[in-house]
């Protein structure tokens, strides 16, 4: 459960991300594909090369979905319901992949926002991404 401090930390950190949301999302995807090659199997139709327009476009989708989640931090299930349906019923993404992408997002944010990425902010973002992952996998059960 996200505390009020966690929510404040997440919102403040996401404000710092700002207009870089698509870039950071794409970078996190690239990190995931390089670090966890099995995740590539969900994107057989993508050009997964560095700087690929398809990875950039999907990175923006990821970033925009997280921006929506931050904006609806008190109702993540409502905000992410359609995305949960898509990933569970149509795409059938293995739930572990959300954890892998979350880790890569944390690494990406830490590399771009080092002075803002305090232990408290790190913990809050980790809890937030875990909450998002839980919602996205809730319809698998």
Swiss-Prot record:
Q: Identify the residues that bind heme b.
A: 87
Q: In which tissues is it expressed?
A: Red blood cells.
**Biological process (GO), any one:** hydrogen peroxide catabolic process
Provide this UniProt record's keywords sorted from A to Z: Acetylation, Heme, Iron, Metal-binding, Oxygen transport, Phosphoprotein, Transport
Q: Which Gene3D superfamilies match?
A: Globins
This protein's GO CC annotations: blood microparticle; haptoglobin-hemoglobin complex; hemoglobin complex
The record describes its quaternary structure and partners as:
Heterotetramer of two alpha chains and two beta chains.
For this chain, the family text in UniProt reads:
Belongs to the globin family.
Q: What is this protein called?
A: Hemoglobin subunit alpha
Q: Which organism is it from?
A: Pteropus vampyrus
Gene for this chain = HBA
């Amino acid at each position: 459960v996200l505390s009020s401090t966690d929510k404040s930390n997440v919102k403040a950190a996401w404000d710092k991300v700002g207009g870089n949301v698509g870039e950071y999302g794409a970078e996190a995807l690239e990190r995931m594909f390089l670090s966890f090659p099995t995740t590539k199997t969900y994107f057989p139709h993508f050009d997964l090369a560095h700087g690929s327009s398809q990875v950039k476009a999907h990175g923006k989708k990821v970033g925009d979905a997280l921006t929506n989640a931050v904006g609806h931090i008190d109702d993540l299930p409502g905000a992410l319901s359609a995305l949960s349906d898509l990933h569970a019923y149509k795409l059938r993404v293995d739930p572990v992949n959300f954890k892998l992408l979350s880790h890569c997002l944390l690494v990406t944010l830490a590399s771009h926002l080092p002075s803002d990425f305090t232990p408290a902010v790190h913990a809050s973002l980790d809890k937030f991404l875990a909450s998002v992952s839980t919602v996205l996998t809730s319809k698998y059960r």
